[in-house]
Regions:
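Central cavity-lining transmembrane alpha-helices of secondary-active solute carriers
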Residues: 23-48, 61-74, 152-160, 288-303
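Intracellular loop-helix junctions on the cytosolic face of multi-pass helical membrane proteins
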Residues: 96-109, 114, 122-123, 127-128, ...
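Helix-loop boundary and gating motifs at the non-cytosolic
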Residues: 1-33, 238-274
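Intracellular helix-loop hinge segments at the cytoplasmic ends of transmembrane helices
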Residues: 11, 128-134, 262
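Loop-to-transmembrane helix entry
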Residues: 12, 19-29, 145-146, 178-182, ...
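C-terminal ends and interior cores of transmembrane alpha-helices
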Residues: 59-102, 339-346
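Helix-to-loop junctions at the C-terminal end of transmembrane segments
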Residues: 35-52, 166, 295-335
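Residue-level signature of the transmembrane alpha-helical cores
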Residues: 58-68, 112, 186-187, 194, ...
């Protein structure tokens, strides 16, 4: 679903008649939803005493993501159906009906993307929390590494689905519409299958609290927000610096992730002078190459971080002035992160 939004979100909104400036107001839902949903929903699931403490939020977020995806994919037929109910327009030949249908489609699509961003951020934070719940302190680094690998693999599969021509698949003919609608339905179904497997085969156990009186939802949300603020103010200085760097890095990643396919489409339109699904598939192919490179980097670069894996006795056997000892000390995740940030800035 995330691949669907990144690869086809901006081109789809532009095809509905929204300007490039207006799409920026749509995508502001991404960081805004992450700022709100991830800490609040994570805190709510932490305080839950149910034996389904994480999974109930995961299933709820998954359901909302699926509904929002279908709302976006079928926004045009839904808008026509709503116009028929209200009785706007005399028929398909009425220009006023087309005008209202276009505006209604834009409203439903923008609303769907906002709901999708909030729900998918909730699904992401619950998934990460569920992984850490079942990993010991000694296994959390490995669990996070596998989480990153699965994200990269999902991105590759998602961008591949956006690259191939789904209109030629007979099994998807019942969906109707173009490439975007079929890609949306496929991504929603795959997400539902993966979340269902996770919820069925991941056990949880309820937590016990000393409080005997149940609190209301609004009270729990307020307490969660206050807790997040307190934790944020008490962060160590090195962690605050990392957060500041990530803030600035995200500002540069934002236009790349959401507008890279549009950039590829603009170059294709200058050459072909026309719009088609093939151009959108070309944008997905560009993101597929990006996902493949990210997968390779995620697998190779951590293994190059020798300083965190070299045992101290082995390090001490090297001569203090040897070049090998200096290289081992210098090759760390922090060094790779700094070098990656520099390349991103360039």
């Amino acid at each position: 679903v995330w691949s669907l939004e990144l690869a086809y979100g901006t081109p789809y909104l532009l095809s509905l008649g929204l300007s490039k400036e207006a799409t920026g107001y749509v995508w502001i839902a991404g960081p805004l939803s992450g700022l709100i949903m991830q800490p609040v929903l994570g805190s709510l699931s932490d305080s839950s005493m149910s034996q389904f403490r994480r999974r109930k939020y995961m299933l709820g977020s998954c359901g909302v993501v699926a509904l929002a995806t279908c709302l976006i994919a079928f926004s045009e037929p839904i808008s026509l159906y709503l116009l028929d109910i209200v009785g706007i327009g005399l028929g398909d030949w009425d220009p006023s009906r087309h005008k209202h249908a276009k505006r209604m489609t834009q409203v439903l699509s923008v609303l769907g993307f906002w709901i999708l961003d909030f729900a998918i951020n909730g699904l992401q934070v619950i998934s990460r929390a569920l992984i850490l719940d079942h990993a010991d302190a000694s296994q959390q680094n490995e669990a996070n590494a596998w989480h990153g690998r699965m994200l990269h693999a999902g991105s590759i599969i998602g961008y591949w689905c956006g690259w191939v021509d789904l209109s030629t698949w007979p099994s998807l003919a019942w969906i109707g519409g173009g490439q975007f609608r079929r890609f949306a339905v496929v991504s929603a179904v795959c997400m539902g299958i993966c979340v269902s497997i996770t919820c069925l085969f991941t056990p949880e156990y309820g937590t016990k609290h000393t409080t005997t009186s149940p609190e209301g939802l609004i009270t729990r949300i307020g307490a969660s927000v206050r807790q997040v603020v307190r934790v944020g103010r008490a962060l160590p200085v090195p962690i605050q610096r990392v957060c500041l760097v990530e803030l600035l890095a995200t500002m540069s990643w934002f236009p790349f992730l959401f507008y890279s396919t549009t950039y590829v489409l603009d170059m294709a339109h200058r050459k072909h002078k026309r719009h088609s699904d093939a151009d959108h598939e070309l944008g997905s192919f560009a993101m597929l190459c990006f996902a493949l490179l990210a997968m390779v980097s995620g697998l190779v670069l951590p293994s190059l971080s020798l300083a965190g894996k070299m045992r101290p006795p082995l390090l001490e056997t090297l001569p203090p002035t040897s070049s090998s000892r200096r290289r081992v000390r210098g090759m760390s995740l922090r060094t790779l992160w700094t070098f990656g940030s520099f390349l991103q800035a360039v």
